[in-house]
Amino acid sequence: MHSPYLTGHDFYRFYQCPHWPYWERFGDPNLRRPLTEAEEQRLADGLTHEQAIVTKIYGGFDEVKTKDVDEAFAQTLELMKRGVPVIYQACLKSGDWVGRPDILERRPGKSLLGDWYYVPVDVKRAHELKKEHMAQLTFYAVLLERLQGM
């Protein structure tokens, strides 16, 4: 079953194929073919790559580990209020919009949080920034704008 939330992945999927988000949300899940072993491996490799890049670039970071949206959002908001430098696997929420950027990076500047604000960063296995990546990051930026008042 598809999430009841509008997510950054929905925007990514839309740019891949405009019909994809519709079928994800309203299509019969029994008609969906299971992932192949190669597809499962590619997903696992992508996560391993992401974790390696985040560790290499940022070293230490605070991680939001829970998958529950409300718990993950509460943890993320608490870390943002504390002003931690890097949040890995953050969860942003506003109404029925939910985003899970790979990283939130703290920057100096005024926001509702204090003398800092956060920007979204996503790790991709690509040599160039694609429009679907920009759509995801823009979605996360809109959520951050709502949360940070800027």
Residue ranges of predicted features:
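Metal-dependent nuclease catalytic cores that hydrolyze phosphodiester bonds in DNA/RNA
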Residues: M1-L113
